[in-house]
Every structure is written in structure tokens, then in C-alpha cells.
């Protein structure tokens, strides 16, 4: 089932402390951004990629796209101050498609199998997001003091991609913009419309590159996958 994907790529990545867009940092000699883009470039069901970028980084990103032969990118609109604004910027330029995915550009380890499950779920139910079950004991804390232990069985750690029927995510984005609501993710905008969002079990490897420690973990994942391919 075909889809297009939006990748907000205009963030600052302050927690990485790299002094540059973290998406340009390399994992095994290749930029994080390219690792992520190649997942969708190589997926035959992906018909288009939209990258929201900083204007001052557009030329460099285009050079990367050319160097690594990423041909599915349909647009590089300006990113906004927040992720939600960047996604909305891309949505305004898209023509109608069946399914739209929104994915963190700093999550390069998503698999085609998980993507396919998300697209199917979004087709069936309208909205679906990737997530994994919480593994650690969870505590509710206020002012440095534990208030209660939360039931872990009902808790999921949410990832991306998040997948939606086109008309649903457009409506959710438009309503949020009109009332000035800023959500933490696209699913939250859809939830505000009263629409049910389904969850698709993902992988603990689908980590977001946020800190220097994540880079070490990311390189370990790449090496493990390379070994599996050669077995």
C-alpha cells in the first residue's frame, strides 16, 4: 500500500551538543539523515518524501541528496519553530494521497515491516502510531518525591513513524493552527478531534539519535545488521 512521508529536519539538536544539525553527524561514515532517507528510498511503497529544512541548510541537504542518490524527495519547504509547524509546512505543499507518514529524521533504524504494519493500520482505522512497551518500573514524581508507582502494563513509549489518512491529518493540523494549539506529536492533534489512534508494536532498536550515547548504540545496531546480512 503506497504512502508519502514527511520528515521534519529543521531542529537544532541541542541535547546532542554537536554544534551543528545532528542529522549531519555520521554513523559509520554516513550522515544520520541519509541513513533515514535510504529506508524510504528503498521502500517500493513509498512514493514521495518531504523534508522540512532550515533555509540556510537547504543547499547542503540538496548536495547530500544528490551524492547519495536520494531521488524520491518531492520538496524541501522551510521548517518552522516547532516540529508541528514543520509538518504543517510540508502538508500545505502535498497533493492528496491515501496515507501520510510523519517520521523523526533522527530515527534511522525503522524497518519496512513496521512501516507496512503502520500503513495498513492507518488505512483500516485512520490513524496509527509506532511504540514499544515500557520495560522499566515507572514512578510518578513531584518535586523530587515519588507520589506513586504507575502500572507499567498500560504504558507505551511512543516512537515514529505515525501514520494517518491524508484528510484526517490535514484536518487535525488545520484545527490546531486555527486555535493555536501546540501538540507534542501528530497523534495528539488527531486525538483532539475525538478520533481513535491505534498503536503498532515497533522495535527497541528504533531509537532516536538524541545524545552522544545514542550514536554509540546506533553504530552497534548498524554493525549487527551488517553481520546478519553477511550470514
Swiss-Prot record:
GO terms for biological process: isopentenyl diphosphate biosynthetic process, methylerythritol 4-phosphate pathway. It comes from the Bacteria. It holds the Pfam family IspD. One of its GO terms (molecular function) is 2-C-methyl-D-erythritol 4-phosphate cytidylyltransferase activity. Belongs to the IspD/TarI cytidylyltransferase family. IspD subfamily. Catalyzes the formation of 4-diphosphocytidyl-2-C-methyl-D-erythritol from CTP and 2-C-methyl-D-erythritol 4-phosphate (MEP). It is an enzyme of class 2 (transferase). Pathway: Isoprenoid biosynthesis; isopentenyl diphosphate biosynthesis via DXP pathway; isopentenyl diphosphate from 1-deoxy-D-xylulose 5-phosphate: step 2/6. The gene is ispD. The keyword Acetylation does not apply. CDD domains: CDP-ME_synthetase. The record marks 152, 208 as: Positions MEP for the nucleophilic attack. Its EC number is 2.7.7.60. It catalyses: 2-C-methyl-D-erythritol 4-phosphate + CTP + H(+) = 4-CDP-2-C-methyl-D-erythritol + diphosphate. NCBIfam families: ispD. This is 2-C-methyl-D-erythritol 4-phosphate cytidylyltransferase. Keywords: Isoprene biosynthesis, Nucleotidyltransferase, Transferase. The record marks 15, 22 as: Transition state stabilizer.
